[in-house]
Amino acid sequence: MQLGLNYRSDNVIKYVGKFGGVTAGGYWSFGNGVAGAGEVAGQFRRDTGYGASLSYSGGPFGATVVYDQYNPTLSATTGATGAFRKVALAASYETGPVKVMGGYRWGLNKGTTDATLLRDNYYWIGANYQATAALGLTLAYYYDDIRNVAGFNVKNPWQVTFIADYAFSKRTDVYLTTAYSKNSGLNFDTSAISFANAYYLGAGADNMIGVAVGVRHRF
């Protein structure tokens, strides 16, 4: 949902440790950004990013909790930074040929003056069904409850996705993917992350559908 170049983290140190059914991870980005120049002497916080995750997988059940924060430069003139925070929880359960999964992500973007740029609750639920040894089906639903965007309460976007994948062999498969989206009439880049790249919906252009078919071969 959120666009812009600020979401790519370079210059990263990452750790992943596995302890039985538990996997722990963490990362630190030393400095990257669009408006800023990355690492700046005497400005340790500028364009930094960090996060941590903890997941468990045991038998048919799996669960994950994740925290992520990025402190992008929002003013190239003053070097002032914002704070974009995300916390996510997700779980899955598998029984026979069916695997169901769902999750929740809390989000809060703060600007240079600590004003709220974006506050939202993002939900998703889906299922994988292995119909045959070769045919796999996936259905998923995504919903973003946008509570506040720069002082406005806008319509909530959502999307339904369906994927069918048929394997000819261990290395070659063909797939069909479709999605229907109900869009929100919002310029996310400017309003939600203070980025210069902007887009607006045209009149009546509040939904879209996409279909793709392809063949994949693994080398």
Task: Place the predicted regions along the sequence by residue.
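Outer-membrane beta-barrel and related beta-rich outer-membrane complex signature
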Residues: G38, T77, D114, G151, ...
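Short loop/turn motifs that connect adjacent beta-strands in outer-membrane beta-barrel proteins
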Residues: G21, A134, K170-R171, A205
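Primarily extracellular Gram-negative trimeric autotransporter adhesin
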Residues: G185-D189, A198-D206, H217
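Outer-membrane beta-barrel "beta-signal"
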Residues: F162, F168, A203-F219
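Outer-membrane beta-barrel biogenesis signature
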Residues: M1-G4, K170-Y175, A179, L186-A192, ...
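Detector for outer-membrane/organellar transmembrane beta-barrel domains
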Residues: R45, Y50-A167, T177-S181
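Surface-exposed coil loops of outer-membrane beta-barrel proteins
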Residues: M1-Y50, F195-Y200
